[in-house]
């Protein structure tokens, strides 16, 4: 019985994706089940002078149970919500085994494809039934019909600046103790190329060359499975457990549906992709604050991607943090953090220029300071700008370079750099 229920859900999903619409045959059920989902159950029936028929009590019980199941699917797997409610009548929710359904199917990778005009159909029902301002409904609409394209960044391409060998002191200042500990026990930290006393190769930063798009921070970590579960609570439990070093194997191929590296859908849930590793997306906002610390959390909040997600009512999860776990190296994972760069107009309004003349092989031609923001411009026309509280180690690199090549470097400018860096 359960198997037939599951198959019916995926048959409806396949039909919707094939037609890119909701067939007329489902419209009555769609309206009834949207009302059940987005209106609160009425509570116990009030006593009446005449005895109520048993079917009234049964109907109320079924709708209350269905409300809980529908809402849980909506919260965890919004892309599956419409096919699920169309294939699962309220009566079936009484015996529906949601835990078993999660375990047997990779629900996080499901995507429904609806034409934009279907939004009018849903909005008409919402307006008529009075739940058009319901927070869950608005978030569903933003998930299914995101406004505008998700902001891209050239930091994810080859056309970017890449900085490696971060200063350890700055890493401990910027990241939480939990993240620093995960770096220290990662395989990368013990590799021959990562044995410098003051720097680490576990941190890499990529910045766009010629624009103000988001920056990317790459971290080589060895995160405990419990931490990954906290960051990605919607990830399939079976897949998470299979990534444990004790399991000795990676997830089965059948669990992988999404294309690796795709970033074109709003994330209200974790997406797991398979290539050389397994990519988890849709991190919990509250977990990011506790796991990464307030500085990284603040930088994520200022990113263009996070602002776009908020505009689309993605308030609890974000694609700004993803983790790629390497099944052949279960102790090693690459964490990708997308952070804010700088507002273009704000940068142009408030800048103080200090000229530098350095005789390095790839000399820095200009250092730009602006309160808590600084930029480095090379001899090439491109320049990079980033927030000081995220890139302390780059500021240290500039100072060290200036000290090594002090000829022609204004002494007052060097003192200014050192003073601002202490802030």
From Swiss-Prot:
It is found in: Nucleus. It comes from the Eukaryota. Transmembrane segments: none annotated. Keywords: Nucleus. Its main location: nucleus. GO terms for cellular component: nucleus. Residues 157-187 are annotated as: RNA recognition motif (RRM)-like domain. A motif (Bipartite nuclear localization signal) lies at residues 46-69. Residues 243-273 are annotated as: Disordered. Residues 243-257 have a biased composition (Polar residues). The N-terminal bipartite nuclear localization signalis required for nuclear localization and generation of the H-MORPH morphotype. Probably modulates the generation of the hypoxia-typic morphotype (called H-MORPH) with altered biofilm architecture that leads to increased host inflammation, rapid disease progression, and mortality in a murine model of invasive aspergillosis. Belongs to the hrmA family. This is Hypoxia responsive morphology factor B.
């Amino acid at each position: 019985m359960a198997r037939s229920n599951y198959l019916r859900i995926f048959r409806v999903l396949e039909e919707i994706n094939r037609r890119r619409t909701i067939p007329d045959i489902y419209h009555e059920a769609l309206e009834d089940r949207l009302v059940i989902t987005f209106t609160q159950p009425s509570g116990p029936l009030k006593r009446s002078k005449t005895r109520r028929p048993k079917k009234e009590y049964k109907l109320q019980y079924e709708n209350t149970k269905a409300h809980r199941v529908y809402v849980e699917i909506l919260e965890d797997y919004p892309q599956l919500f419409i096919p699920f409610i169309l294939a699962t009548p309220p009566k079936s929710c009484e015996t529906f085994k949601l835990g078993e359904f999660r375990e047997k199917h990779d629900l996080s990778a499901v995507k429904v494809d609806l034409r934009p005009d279907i939004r009018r159909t849903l909005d008409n029902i919402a307006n008529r039934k009075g739940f058009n301002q319901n927070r869950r409904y608005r978030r569903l609409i933003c998930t299914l019909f995101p406004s505008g394209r998700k902001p891209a960044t050239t930091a994810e391409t080859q056309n970017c600046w890449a900085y490696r060998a971060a200063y350890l002191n700055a890493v401990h200042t910027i990241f939480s103790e939990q993240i620093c500990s995960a770096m220290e026990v990662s395989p990368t930290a013990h590799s021959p190329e990562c044995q410098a006393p003051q720097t680490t190769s576990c941190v890499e930063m990529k910045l766009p060359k010629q624009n103000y798009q988001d920056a990317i921070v790459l971290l080589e970590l060895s995160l405990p499975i419990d931490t990954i579960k906290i960051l990605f609570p919607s990830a399939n439990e079976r897949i998470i457990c299979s990534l444990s070093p004790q399991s000795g194997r990676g997830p089965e191929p059948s669990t992988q549906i999404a294309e690796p590296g795709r970033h074109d859908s709003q994330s209200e849930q974790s997406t797991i992709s398979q290539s050389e590793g397994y990519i988890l997306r849709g991190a919990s906002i509250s977990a990011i604050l506790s796991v990464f610390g307030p500085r990284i959390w603040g930088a994520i909040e200022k990113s263009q991607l996070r602002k776009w997600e908020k505009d689309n009512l993605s308030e609890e999860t974000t694609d700004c943090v993803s983790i790629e776990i390497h099944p052949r190296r279960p102790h090693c994972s690459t964490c990708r953090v997308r952070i804010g760069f700088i507002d273009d107009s704000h940068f142009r309004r408030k800048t103080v220029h200090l000229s530098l003349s350095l005789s390095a092989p790839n000399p820095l031609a200009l250092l730009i300071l602006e309160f808590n923001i600084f930029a480095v411009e090379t001899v090439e026309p491109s320049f990079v700008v980033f927030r000081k509280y995220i890139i302390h180690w780059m500021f240290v690199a500039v100072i060290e370079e200036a000290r090594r090549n002090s000829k022609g470097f204004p002494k007052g400018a060097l003192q200014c750099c050192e003073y601002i860096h202490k802030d």
